[in-house]
């Protein structure tokens, strides 16, 4: 009995030694699974990747490039557009961006989609996006739009006067959309065209984004 007890005690001591040794190796390697990843600067409510130790299943990240409009969605009779390759996660922000230019290269539509943490983050994200518009346009008074949630349109010329600029901002679910229409100076995009393109993008987001957690 004394020999069996001594054997069990030796085994326990060995397990403790090995466990402490493994923990020591983790510390030496610099791995610290208890700290989150560094946050990425972004708009308020914009998702940023972090590490987690939760055992709950994690939803796959959304591929926003497949939710962007294509050239055929913007083209009209007698005015065909061509899309450049889409950019995933521009400026390290979850989302996507694409530039669509007409064949005469006199008009362009650029679409930026940015993921939000939740629909509740929409108002603050819209406010921040609207505040930054002066970098690309000398806007007139903002006008409400029927597109999405919080839809707002501003129109004017670029700061250098080289082109007309109309920007539509709105949110749809957990995403912010910024749709910019560029054209010749003094010839802003037609209001119906802006609304039509915006509604198509809102529908693409509504259909393609996963339902918020807790939604049946």
Sequence positions of predicted segments:
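Bacterial N-terminal signal peptides that target proteins for export
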Residues: 2-13
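C-terminal motif of bacterial Sec signal peptides marking the signal peptidase cleavage site
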Residues: 20-24
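N-terminal "mature-domain start" segment
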Residues: 26-98, 191-198, 202-216
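Short Gly/Thr-rich strand-loop-strand
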Residues: 75-89, 123-168, 203-216
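Short, surface-exposed beta-strand/loop micro-motifs that present aromatic residues
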Residues: 95-102, 164-172
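A short acidic-to-branched-hydrophobic micro-motif
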Residues: 96-126
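Short, well-ordered beta-strand elements
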Residues: 110-112, 174-183
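A short acidic/glycine-rich loop-to-helix N-cap element
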Residues: 179-196
